[in-house]
Curated annotation (Swiss-Prot):
MF term (GO), any: 2-methoxy-6-polyprenyl-1,4-benzoquinol methyltransferase activity
Classification of source organism: Bacteria, Pseudomonadati, Thermodesulfobacteriota, Desulfuromonadia, Desulfuromonadales
EC top class named in words: transferase
The protein's name: Ubiquinone/menaquinone biosynthesis C-methyltransferase UbiE
Gene from which this protein is expressed: ubiE
Name of one Pfam family that matches: Ubie_methyltran
CDD domains: AdoMet_MTases (cd02440)
């Protein structure tokens, strides 16, 4: 594990630093596939009609904007701990015409009343949360009974060949490009944070312990990314 990353470290300063080039590097380093991953998660929300959707760790607002476009009657609340990320999001969200609200807060302490969201999503953010179980419990608290949670996160590919290629890319290529354009430390942190994240079955267990039912996962792009889903338990479950 490199000297730039320590388990339990507050990553807010890191994300504040990379905010100006965050979108550019996402497109470049993923070869544009990150957009498809986010859209897959947004489609999975399957919101019927109006509703309030929490976009946790909203970053520069890509997911929030996709939700507003896909569900014209939805209200979106985007929450992020990094103020610089939120500042970068503001001009991008103008097409949503006021249907997206941005709040600076942590996932472990959401500034939302209980049972006020119809669905919640967090894309590429849960691995950076210091207290993941607490965050999952917060998602459960703010969701209405039966409300859906979607978690999109990097994973370890299950195919040994792909896993080796991905590890080589994430360990050696990605940090060099990231260092040239933005902050090398941030992109050295990325592979360490992915490897430190719980295995698929373990994370599904954490969701169940936090009050979610019907939990499942679906691998995307050979398991480089995994989409987790679950529904907040109903009374009597």
């Amino acid at each position: 594990m490199n000297k730039d990353y320590r388990p339990g470290q507050d990553t807010r300063p890191l994300f504040d630093r990379i905010a100006p080039r965050y979108d550019l590097l996402n497109r470049l380093l993923s070869f544009g596939i990150d957009r498809r991953w986010r859209l897959a998660a947004v489609r999975e929300l399957a919101l019927a009609g109006a509703g309030r959707i929490l976009d946790a760790a909203t970053g520069t607002g890509d997911v929030a904007l996709s939700i507003a476009a896909a569900y014209p009657r939805a209200e979106v609340v985007g929450v992020d701990l990094s103020m610089n990320m939120l500042r970068a999001a503001v001009p991008k969200l103008l097409p949503a015409e006021g249907r997206i609200t941005l709040l600076q807060a942590s996932c472990e302490s959401l500034p939302l009343a209980a049972e006020t969201c119809d669905a919640a999503i967090i894309a590429f953010g849960i691995r950076n949360v210091l207290q993941r179980q607490v965050a999952l419990q917060e998602f459960s608290r703010v969701l209405k009974p039966g409300g859906r949670l979607l978690v999109l996160e990097f994973s370890q590919p299950t195919n040994p060949l792909l896993a080796g290629l991905y590890r080589c890319y994430s360990r050696h290529v990605l940090p060099r490009i990231g260092g040239l354009i933005s902050d090398g430390a941030a992109y050295r942190y990325l592979p360490d944070s992915v490897e430190a994240f719980p295995a698929r079955g373990e994370f599904l267990g954490m969701m169940e312990q936090s009050g979610f039912r019907h939990v499942r996962h679906r691998d995307l792009t050979g398991g480089i990314v995994t989409l987790y889903s679950g529904c907040r338990s109903l009374p009597g479950d």
